[in-house]
Amino acid sequence: MTAEIAKFGHIALITPNLEKSVWFFRDIVGLEEVDRQGDTIFLRAWGDWEHHTLSLTPGNRARVDHIAWRTKRPEDVETFAEQLKAKGTEVQWIEPGEEKGQGKAIRFRLPNGYPFEIYYDVEKPKAPEGKKSRLKNNVYRPSYGIAPRRIDHVNVWTTNPSEIHQWLKDNMGFKMREYIRLNNGFVAGGWMSVTPLVHDIGVMVDPKGQPNRLHHFAYYLDNVTDILRAADILREHDITIEMGGPGRHGISQAFFLYVKDPGSGHRLELFSGGYLIFDPDWEPIEWQEHELQEGLIWYGPEMKPGGPMDDTTEC
């Protein structure tokens, strides 16, 4: 049976100012602190069932420790390990409990250096009394901060996106949903998923020529009014909203608001809307160079090439 990826699981970040990063993600964004292991703090949104969807660890510079994907079956982890090794990829085994709340996993790097993790076994702790939702199909009751529902996607940049698109398709079963093709034929970005979401991962070209960078990761809010409320909360705490405010992407049809963690500089997208794909024979949507601006910004603040939105952090 072919090994399959089920979903985007979590992202593990290194931050040079752990205290400020925890303040931002826990107290302002409204993620729940679930657990601690040494200096690492594990968090999740009120609708996330798995042990954590974000971990924060102190370090001397901001970088991504790993981007994690959950498989559909327990045996898929071993199968992925064997397939990757057969193709010459170095695979590191992570023992149960080495990452709090998680079973046996593998870590490896893509050809351009992205650090990935694949796992299946994971704890799903219940919310403590006093935070538990009265709705049996929720984990926590949303009670403070921006309070996104769940983790959504990750967006990474590299020098040649097409190579990574093909690698993800061939090795992990991702499907292309939308992409940008320039006049010279170069594919500048692609939005891919293994779920019905319009994207679980976006891979785009880095205009600075860096091979393995994190542009942002995203948490999902239920509706656009939550995005507007998030903007108010950020401004009340004197946190800069990138590009000056929220807007809507043409690609993915999603509403967005971008903000950097003041402790690390890692960029967070607060994301709402989008669309789901159920067609097994989906034809990827091509955006051409003359349509690029509408694809990136359907309406809202202008995203200027060479501006602050080109900033990324290390993978």
Curated annotation (Swiss-Prot):
GO biological process terms held by the UniProt record: catabolic process
GO MF assignments: biphenyl-2,3-diol 1,2-dioxygenase activity; metal ion binding
pH dependence per the UniProt record: Optimum pH is 7.5.
Binding site for Mn(2+): H153, H216, E269
Cofactors, names only: Mn(2+)
Keywords (A to Z) from UniProt: Aromatic hydrocarbons catabolism, Dioxygenase, Manganese, Metal-binding, Oxidoreductase, Repeat
Temperature curve summary: Optimum temperature is 85 degrees Celsius.
Major enzyme class: oxidoreductase
Protein origin, superkingdom: Bacteria
Pathway: Xenobiotic degradation; biphenyl degradation; 2-hydroxy-2,4-pentadienoate and benzoate from biphenyl: step 3/4
Record's catalysed reaction(s): biphenyl-2,3-diol + O2 = 2-hydroxy-6-oxo-6-phenylhexa-2,4-dienoate + H(+)
Keyword Manganese (UniProt): yes
Cofactor binding annotation: Binds 1 Mn(2+) ion per subunit.
Annotated ranges, domain VOC: 7-121, 150-273
Enzyme Commission no: 1.13.11.39
The protein's assembly and partners: Homotetramer.
Family to which this protein belongs: Belongs to the extradiol ring-cleavage dioxygenase family.
Function: Catalyzes the meta-cleavage of the hydroxylated biphenyl ring. The enzyme can oxidize a wide range of substrates, and the substrate preference order is 2,3-dihydroxybiphenyl > 3-methylcatechol > catechol > 4-methylcatechol > 4-chlorocatechol.
Protein name listed in UniProt: Manganese-dependent 2,3-dihydroxybiphenyl 1,2-dioxygenase
